[in-house]
């Protein structure tokens, strides 16, 4: 068997998430159907580096799969790109060693979150950015977001019901910038892993701080007390993008 690593992007609007699930359309299922056709009807299972939720997009999701023979990498990429649905794009395909695992090999992830702060909002971006129609002070958000960098227990920013016991994660980059051309706020978070709905909960909290309905010091309180009720609301999935995954050599 030959193992392949692929980098893909997808429009999350039409999917119930990346992971295969009954009675709902998923990115995994669509790709596996295409690979099974290419593999002459023999089932192929893919393994993704991350499991994005319903409505969440990806610019650089990584996955791997095995096929019984060597194939030309570009021809395989082209076949997958043209035979999968139009809301999935295969950016690259390459052969990798048999011990490569997209999820378990040590890596870091970068996410972006887009917030449309225009009044009126841009209706063409309603599935691709979360609209926030209330006044915001960027300086307050910048001061608050810097406190998220470093190694912390992010229990207070995690959705209830998660089965993950160790909630300590390291965020190496947390920043926000204003995109004047689109009238968007662009949040960027990089780290060694993120908990269920962690980024959406952090963004919801930061927007509340920017709107002066929560003090900047609330970030430290949430981290210290590990209480989800102290954080802001969960931002919508439509603004979230898995931007890049980087593997250690």
Swiss-Prot record:
The active site is at 53 (nucleophile). The keyword Electron transport does not apply. CDD domains: PseudoU_synth_EcTruA. Substrate binds at residue 111. One of its GO terms (molecular function) is RNA binding. Belongs to the tRNA pseudouridine synthase TruA family. NCBIfam families: hisT_truA. Homodimer. This is tRNA pseudouridine synthase A. It comes from Streptococcus sanguinis (strain SK36).
